[in-house]
């Protein structure tokens, strides 16, 4: 393979990666969610969602209601959690920047397959999730079991190495 072909292959790969990144950013802007697509990692939401389901999030609503399934991130952890809103209330607070009173929505969540609410998961002293600060989005659609590839890659080291070897082998075979 000559230099021109290598540069062409590299440019093609860069275009694929740039297109994927652009699609992700566009989807993030449209849904107003930093994480518009998530994979269910546990069975806490069964039977509504199974482990491995891919969820699509929407974060354009001002408020979410009791019964809505939301995805939130805890302050200390990087893993998004998919649970249902079981209680909500609103409080009036003074906005720090504008000094005007604003209504803030507070939420309590629980997994459908869990016996108790999520209070023990929240940060020490935190009673509720704040809609604007903690919620990544409300679930508006899903694709069953497609996310199992992600789970296999993160949980099984051998699968990850086999997949990388397969990708490397396919790149070598394609070049010939």
Swiss-Prot record:
Compartments in which it is found: Endoplasmic reticulum membrane
Keyword Transmembrane helix: yes
Main location: endoplasmic reticulum
Role according to the record: Catalytic component of the signal peptidase complex (SPC) which catalyzes the cleavage of N-terminal signal sequences from nascent proteins as they are translocated into the lumen of the endoplasmic reticulum. Specifically cleaves N-terminal signal peptides that contain a hydrophobic alpha-helix (h-region) shorter than 18-20 amino acids.
Catalytic activity: Cleavage of hydrophobic, N-terminal signal or leader sequences from secreted and periplasmic proteins
Sections of the chain in a coiled coil: none
Domains: entry comment: The C-terminal short (CTS) helix is essential for catalytic activity. It may be accommodated as a transmembrane helix in the thinned membrane environment of the complex, similarly to the signal peptide in the complex substrates.
Lumenal compartment residues: 31-176
Membrane topology: Single-pass type II membrane protein
GO molecular function annotations of the record: serine-type endopeptidase activity
Chain spans, region C-terminal short (CTS) helix: 162-173
Keywords: Endoplasmic reticulum, Hydrolase, Membrane, Protease, Signal-anchor, Transmembrane, Transmembrane helix
SUPFAM superfamilies with a match to the protein in the record: LexA/Signal peptidase (SSF51306)
Identification of the protein by name: Signal peptidase complex catalytic subunit SEC11
């Amino acid at each position: 393979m000559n230099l021109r072909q290598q540069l062409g292959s590299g440019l093609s790969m860069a275009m694929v990666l740039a297109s994927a990144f652009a699609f992700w950013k566009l989807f993030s802007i449209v849904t107003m969610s930093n994480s518009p697509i998530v994979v269910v990692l546990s069975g806490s939401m069964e039977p509504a969602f199974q482990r491995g389901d891919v969820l699509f999030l929407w974060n354009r609503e001002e408020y979410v209601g009791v019964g809505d399934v939301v995805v939130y991130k805890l302050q200390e952890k990087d893993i998004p959690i998919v649970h249902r809103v079981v209680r909500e209330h609103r409080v009036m607070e003074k906005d720090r920047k504008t000094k005007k009173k604003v209504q803030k929505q507070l939420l309590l969540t629980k997994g459908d397959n869990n016996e108790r609410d999520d209070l023990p998961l929240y940060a020490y002293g935190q009673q509720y999730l704040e809609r604007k600060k903690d919620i990544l989005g409300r679930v508006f659609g899903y694709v069953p079991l497609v996310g199992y590839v992600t789970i296999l890659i993160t949980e099984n080291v051998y699968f990850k190495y086999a997949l990388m070897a397969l990708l490397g082998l396919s790149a070598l075979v394609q070049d010939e």
